[in-house]
Structures are given as C-alpha cells and as structure tokens.
Amino acid sequence: MRPMHGTTVLCVRREGRVVIAGDGQVTLDKTVMKATARKVRRLGEGQVVAGFAGATADAFQLFELFEKKLKEHARSLPRAAVELAKQWRTDRMLRRLEALLLVADREHLLVLSGAGDVIEPDPVANGAAAAIGSGGPYALAAARALLAHSALDARQVAEEAMKLAAEICIYTNGNLTIEEL
C-alpha cells in the first residue's frame, strides 16, 4: 500500500491571534479515502498549535515526540523544535518518517522537517504566515496577500486562504479543522 498524502495546513498570526487550519482530505493514489481527517491539534497544555502534512502514522509519532520535547524544555517552542529536528535527523528510525510539522505559539511560527530544518518564516505586513502540504503554496500566497491588503482578522485570513487553496489543489478540500490561540 502506498502512503497517503496530499494536504494543506496554514498558520496565520495577526494582532496577537494565532490560527492554524488544516483541510480534511486524505488521498491514497488517485482516490479520496477520507474527507474529514483532523490534521491540526493543540499541544503543550493548549499553548501550542500544530499541524502536519505527510504520512498520518508518522505525524502522530512526531506529535508525541514534540509534546515530550515541549515538556522537557519548559514549553519553549524554539528549543523544543530544534531538539526534535536534531533527533529526527539523526535517529535511524525517525529519519524514515515522511512528514512536515507546522507549529506555533503566540510568539513563534515554525516549520520542521526530517532533514533537520527549523524554519521561521519572514514576517509579512501586519502578521506572519506559513503553510505546508500540496496546497501550501496556494494558501500561503493568498494569506500573504490578505495580510498585506485587507483588515481581515487571523481566522478570516486563514479561512479565505484555505478556501482558495481548496479551489486550486486537487489534494485539498474545504472541510477545515481550525485551532486558535
């Protein structure tokens, strides 16, 4: 069985609010297997939001490891992210995991990969945004434009950007799960 793939997860920060949104579509090859998957969640006693793109089982394992790193490092998101990225890159079993994580608290927004990357995107006018997954580039472009040229709040920006991504990316649907800080 080939791994399931295709998703869009977008995180937007504006005026002290942080919103992460994930679509619900899970695709196996050319078939939609599920339309209501939950790809975003809260971690760190509710102070961190996180989403994943990639193999579902791998993502759940990474969520568990990241939760442990948050506890070990007193909920310091950057420190926990760097420690997870180091472990992910150097551990023989973890290196095989196929996923990307998007994590955020009120101050930081980070993308983590198995290559050891911990990327904090550049801020954009009136906020910050990052996206992962097959529809990520579409959602990110829309979010940046909305942040720069509208007065929409963080949730509205995320919803509109995800709507546009779902219209363009065949691996993304409009069944959103949204978490806010």
Swiss-Prot record:
What EC identifiers does the entry list? 3.4.25.2
| Catalytic residue positions | 7
Where is the protein situated, by its record's location annotation? Cytoplasm
Example GO biological process term? proteolysis involved in protein catabolic process
Mark the transmembrane ranges. Answer: none
Activity regulation information from UniProt? Allosterically activated by HslU binding.
Under the heading Gene3D superfamilies, the entry gives: Glutamine Phosphoribosylpyrophosphate, subunit 1, domain 1 (3.60.20.10)
Where Na(+) is bound, by residue? 166, 169, 172
Instruction: State what this protein does.
Output: Protease subunit of a proteasome-like degradation complex believed to be a general protein degrading machinery.
What is its quaternary makeup?
A double ring-shaped homohexamer of HslV is capped on each side by a ring-shaped HslU homohexamer. The assembly of the HslU/HslV complex is dependent on binding of ATP.
Q: What is this protein called?
A: ATP-dependent protease subunit HslV
Organism of origin:
Anaeromyxobacter sp. (strain K)
